[in-house]
Swiss-Prot record:
Pfam families listed in its UniProt record: Pribosyltran
Alphabetical UniProt keywords: Cell inner membrane, Cell membrane, Glycosyltransferase, Magnesium, Membrane, Metal-binding, Purine salvage, Transferase
Recorded GO CC terms: cytosol; plasma membrane
Residues that, per the record, bind xanthine: 92, 135
Chain's gene name: gpt
Entry's EC annotation: 2.4.2.-, 2.4.2.22
Organism, scientific name: Klebsiella pneumoniae subsp. pneumoniae (strain ATCC 700721 / MGH 78578)
Protein name listed in UniProt: Xanthine-guanine phosphoribosyltransferase
Length: 152
């Protein structure tokens, strides 16, 4: 990945609220299935904004911080996804998204961020990201003092 896109907590909440507004009316949803781990925080934000209490997870491992590797389903929510929102932070190459679509063919699959290769696999997303860009999510970063450029 040549570029980095840094996401702040404020930006993430703004994007999640925008996505939540597109998922109204809330009565159409039975619950949320968050893709662990990237979809956990966005899933919590959607659950809060939409007032949804039924939240489950599908646990899929496909990354080690910045390296993609073999896909493993560690835990899945039951059913075919009918009436459920499946949320992940990002659709990238589409590997995880294909697995989600196979497991939950009737779910409404959404992400906050979408790269071109995976974009056709989601029902909705908020932010376009170039394919060669790595996203630094706020839960992967700490707040650190940065000295002034002039060194004062």
């Amino acid at each position: 990945m040549s570029e980095k896109y840094v996401v702040t907590w404020d930006m993430l909440q703004i994007h999640a609220r925008k996505l939540a507004s597109r998922l109204l009316p809330v009565e159409q949803w039975k619950g949320i299935i968050a893709v662990s781990r990237g979809g956990l925080v966005p899933g919590a934000l959607l659950a809060r904004e939409l007032g949804i209490r039924h939240v489950d997870t599908v646990c899929i491992s496909s990354y080690d911080h910045d390296n993609q590797r073999e896909l493993k389903v560690l835990k899945r929510a039951e059913g075919d996804g009918e009436g459920f929102i499946v949320i992940d932070d990002l659709v990238d190459t589409g590997g995880t998204a294909v697995a989600i679509r196979e497991m939950y063919p009737k779910a409404h699959f959404v992400t906050i961020f979408a790269k071109p290769a995976g974009r056709p696999l989601v029902d909705d997303y908020v932010v376009d990201i170039p394919q060669d860009t790595w996203i630094e999510q706020p839960w992967d970063m700490g707040v650190v003092f940065v000295p002034p450029i002039a060194g004062r």
